[in-house]
């Protein structure tokens, strides 16, 4: 699963979700992509499940790019622990996504195959997404 090799601080604050995605709003590598329509957290397990779903459907044809990286740690206290006594230990890693962010890109496959593969991957996420095609930017 994806996670940073090292970070400056082990624990982070929750942060804000407001606004649209600042970067990765266009398809830069592939021909087709999956774009978010909602804001939320995407865990490293969800990203890995999407990657496996796309690769299993496309088999050996095509190339896949993952455009998100889980760089935010989420802490959790042990079960049946009383409140207080500080913040919990880091439990898992998430990527903060806002509307407009490209999550995955696919190339060298037909539109139907790309659409099917990305639809299967979208079922693994907890946020709404849409299928997008590459547009030429000037």
Swiss-Prot record:
Part of the 50S ribosomal subunit. The keyword Ribonucleoprotein applies. Pfam families: Ribosomal_L16. GO terms for cellular component: cytosolic large ribosomal subunit. NCBIfam families: rplP_bact. Belongs to the universal ribosomal protein uL16 family. PANTHER family: 50S/60S RIBOSOMAL PROTEIN L16, LARGE RIBOSOMAL SUBUNIT PROTEIN UL16M. HAMAP family: Ribosomal_uL16. Gene3D superfamilies: Ribosomal protein L10e/L16. GO terms for molecular function: rRNA binding; structural constituent of ribosome; tRNA binding. Keywords: Ribonucleoprotein, Ribosomal protein, RNA-binding, rRNA-binding, tRNA-binding. Coiled coil: none annotated. Binds 23S rRNA and is also seen to make contacts with the A and possibly P site tRNAs. This is Large ribosomal subunit protein uL16. One of its GO terms (biological process) is translation. Disulfide bonds: none annotated. The keyword tRNA-binding applies. It comes from Chlamydia felis (strain Fe/C-56) (Chlamydophila felis).
